[in-house]
Amino acid sequence: MDDVKDKLKGFMKKVNLSSSSGKFKGQGRVLGSSSSSSAPPVNPIQNRFNSSQAPNPTPRPKPNPNPLPEKPLSSSDQKISGSTRNPDHDPVRAPQDGFDPYGAFITSSNRSQNGYSLSMFECPICKNPFTSEEEVSVHVESCLGDTNGDESSFEKDNNDNDKSEMEKLVVVYLSGKPSESSIDVLLRLFKNIVKEPENAKFRKVRMSNAKIKEAIGDVAGGVELLELVGFELKEENDEIWAVMDVPSEEQSILINKVVGYLEKRKTESSGSSAQVMEPVAPKKIDREIRVFFSVSENVASRIEVPDSFYSLSADEIKREADLRRKKIAESQLLIPRSYKEKQAKAARKRYKRSMIRVQFPDGVVLQGVFAPWEPTFALYEFVSSALKEPSLQFELLDPVLVKRRVIPHTPAPGQKPITLEDEELVPSALIRFRPIETDSLVFTGLRNELLEISEPLS
């Protein structure tokens, strides 16, 4: 019994000696914690056993100022935990030399008040925030383009100011409503200077000249335009002259701009005035109405007019002679029929008037004068106004005796109006009147006013 006690004492002594050795000496603590911590040692086996039994322990309401001891981590566990830990969630980490190995390459470096990153990326040029690096890369190119454009903004503003001043003066000049000839005089002056800048004759203008005075002196903004391009007003021999030195390259460019803007505004003003202007009423032609007694068709077809009706000017006579020479030369060649008809149509264009007679069923003949370019419905209106029954429908037959055809009243939809010249009713023609009678409307002849002025056809 005593031997057993002695052996037990020896075993306990060995256990105490091994626990107090240098290998296991010291107090267990969490890495990074203070060595002065006085927390009692924790048995890892007991801790593991307790954690397996209660994985979700209820936290105590009493706060513990000292950190709880944790299980020491091996070197491999430290590497894994260090690599998976987000550096942005570590409020203690702060770069000493300004370089953060865990930070984004392009970042706004702005932190929220809670201590975590906003995951925003900023442009290194304009400092605008973006949500991704791709958006920053796309934005940088446009941002660089904007900075290059800002460098030339001052020069662009100067050009715009010069242009606006030039435009204002041109508008003021045109608002004075100068005549077309006055604008042409000013344009001719500027164009001559650009074309021959060394010619002093174009660079010295006498303001008392009648055309210059009308085009520039009497129009608001005219003198200012001269001064804008480089002219100076001087007095010589009791007269005012606008004198200009040899224009520089910049002045030549400015003169060209003024010329172009003047021509542009001139075209716009003329176009707008043409749109605003009311459509011009067609020139009223004197029909020179005459009415003849009942005669036969052969007698009515003999139309005799005075020589003045066919009177031609000197230019028309010369043109007629040229046409005759061409006709003689072309008669010796084989010419297609279509070309001959085209030539005959061109020959009829020299007539300015056409005398047309309309023969009615009772033998009365109505005569009127028309222009070759008038449409055929003008002939129908003329005949309708002469009837006692203006609402009577009728047709006018072509003067061709072989096969009479109806002269069209109105053109087909989508076609241009047919003229008297197109129907070969120039320079004179005799056409027939054919009424379209109904039970209520019949042909009753011409109006009494026209019958009273009727005369025999000699």
Swiss-Prot record:
Start-end of C2H2-type zinc fingers: 121-143
Induction: Induced in response to powdery mildew and by benzothiadiazole (BTH) treatment.
Keywords: Membrane, Metal-binding, Ubl conjugation pathway, Zinc, Zinc-finger
Gene Ontology CC: membrane; mitochondrion
Phenotype seen when the gene is deleted: Enhanced resistance to powdery mildew with a reduced fungus reproduction.
PROSITE patterns: UBX
Signal peptide: none
Domain PUB: 181-248
Top-level taxon of origin: Eukaryota
Subcellular location: Membrane
Protein name, entry field: Plant UBX domain-containing protein 2
Source organism: Arabidopsis thaliana
